[in-house]
């Protein structure tokens, strides 16, 4: 246990928190071709590959994912939530943070109902997370 005098001379250092979605913390100046230190809640990108992958051990499924090149020229893997999607190569998508626990290396989610991504059809509950409009009637 340090004395108060020792703490006055050399204070405690706080731990540096590591970001869980680092690609959202980088901007890009296309005029100067240099990366900038600008954080954003979402980022736009272009899908370079759309496919399925299998989850880690106790689970079994075919999870839909897209490889996305962001506007800051970083390429990341993002999960496509919901049942069915209309994404293909060269689709423009909006990305948010949020990992998928049983898919290694997937730290981002694609926002449904934004840009080229359509909302989930015939969804009645939890619609806002899947970009679905309120049903008529």
Swiss-Prot record:
Superkingdom per UniProt: Bacteria
PROSITE patterns to which the protein is assigned, alphabetical: RIBOSOMAL_S12
Family matches, as SUPFAM superfamilies: Nucleic acid-binding proteins
An annotated Gene Ontology molecular function: rRNA binding
Bias type Basic residues, positions: 9-20
Chain segments carrying region Disordered: 1-57
Keywords noted in UniProt: Methylation, Ribonucleoprotein, Ribosomal protein, RNA-binding, rRNA-binding, tRNA-binding
Positions bearing 3-methylthioaspartic acid: 102
InterPro entries assigned to the protein according to its UniProt record, in alphabetical order: NA-bd_OB-fold, Ribosomal_uS12, Ribosomal_uS12_bac
GO BP terms, alphabetized: translation
GO cellular component annotations of the record: small ribosomal subunit
Oligomer status and interactors: Part of the 30S ribosomal subunit. Contacts proteins S8 and S17. May interact with IF1 in the 30S initiation complex.
Function, as annotated: With S4 and S5 plays an important role in translational accuracy. Interacts with and stabilizes bases of the 16S rRNA that are involved in tRNA selection in the A site and with the mRNA backbone. Located at the interface of the 30S and 50S subunits, it traverses the body of the 30S subunit contacting proteins on the other side and probably holding the rRNA structure together. The combined cluster of proteins S8, S12 and S17 appears to hold together the shoulder and platform of the 30S subunit.
Family assignment from sequence similarity: Belongs to the universal ribosomal protein uS12 family.
Protein name per its UniProtKB record: Small ribosomal subunit protein uS12
Record organism: Streptococcus suis (strain 05ZYH33)
């Amino acid at each position: 246990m340090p004395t108060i005098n020792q703490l006055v001379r050399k204070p405690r250092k706080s731990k540096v928190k590591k970001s869980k979605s680092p690609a959202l913390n980088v901007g890009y100046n296309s005029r100067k071709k240099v990366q900038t230190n600008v954080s954003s809640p979402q980022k736009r990108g272009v899908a370079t590959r759309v496919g399925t992958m299998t989850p880690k051990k106790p689970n079994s499924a075919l999870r839909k994912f897209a490889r996305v090149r962001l506007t800051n020229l970083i390429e990341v893997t993002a999960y496509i939530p919901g049942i069915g999607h209309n994404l293909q190569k060269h689709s423009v998508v909006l990305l948010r943070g949020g990992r998928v626990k049983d898919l290694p290396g997937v730290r981002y989610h694609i926002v449904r109902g934004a840009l080229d991504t359509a909302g989930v059809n015939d969804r009645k509950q939890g619609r806002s997370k899947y970009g679905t409009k309120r049903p008529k009637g």
